[in-house]
Amino acid sequence: QWGSKTSANSGGLGGVVNIANNQKFNEGLILDARQTYGSFNTWGSYLTVGYSAKNFIARVKAYRNSSDNDFTYTNIATIPYQEMKQKNADFVDYGFMPEMQVRFKNSLLTFVSWNQFSHRNYPQIMPNVFNNTKEYADNDFSRNFLSYKYYWNSGRVEVKSSYFHEVQTYFLESYTSNGNPVTQNHSLNKSDVFRQIIDLQQDLYKSWKLYAKIQWDNEKVSSSNYDSSTTSSPKRNILSLYAAVDGKI
């Protein structure tokens, strides 16, 4: 839970989503392979391999999604109208996610790492077929999460630590019919985020519960879109405390 209703957490008023990712222990071998195919030559390949023991689970997910995204259209900007084919809108995403859970008597240790690499080409504007440009974007990230939960009959405490690293690249170049560059825009943006959370929940009396949380965020971004001599890598440190009592009168 990285956010929830405000009566039990410091989540947003606009609404948040809690994702349940509870693993099943003592299930033995984990093996799942899938292949999909769709329109515009779209392919999806997915593989999950792992093992589930009595108090230990380890698995790795790997995937690859790609599509050509080519399609025909009628270009009304030419005289006479022409049936043409739009190209260079392809994309590919691939990544892997190792996961591990270890269960002790009254505690649970969890580790998850989601790593993805993406490349997407952007086509020329459809009516302007003679515009010579090359345009694409890359988005790579690594999101890592470590959690230790200790629980007792009337409550629990959880310590969570995460590290998010992301790199976004945008490239746009226009060139002449001879292949000589005219303009170029190459943007590189990076972000690094550390997040540490201590979360406590304790039953008090009947339906009454105590919720408390301490959270520290350390964030750093850098971008080639700004002058490095005037704007260094911006940093932000946020320390937040939260406590609430919830129950029925």
Show the residue positions of the predicted features:
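A beta-strand signature from Gram-negative outer-membrane beta-barrel systems
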Residues: 1-28
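Outer-membrane beta-barrel transmembrane domain signature of Gram-negative proteins
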Residues: 137, 163-167, 175-249
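Residue-level signature of outer-membrane beta-barrel architecture
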Residues: 21, 50-53, 102-104, 149-152, ...
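Transmembrane beta-strands of outer-membrane beta-barrel pores
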Residues: 35-39, 53-55, 64-68, 104-106, ...
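Transmembrane beta-strands of outer-membrane beta-barrel proteins
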Residues: 29-33, 58-60, 109-111, 157-161, ...
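Residues embedded in well-ordered regular secondary structure
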Residues: 16, 55-59, 73-74
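Hydrophobic, lipid-facing positions within transmembrane beta-strands of outer-membrane proteins
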Residues: 13-15, 29-31, 43-47, 94-98, ...
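Flexible loop and strand-edge segments within Gram-negative outer membrane beta-barrel domains
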Residues: 67-73, 83, 87-93, 107-157, ...
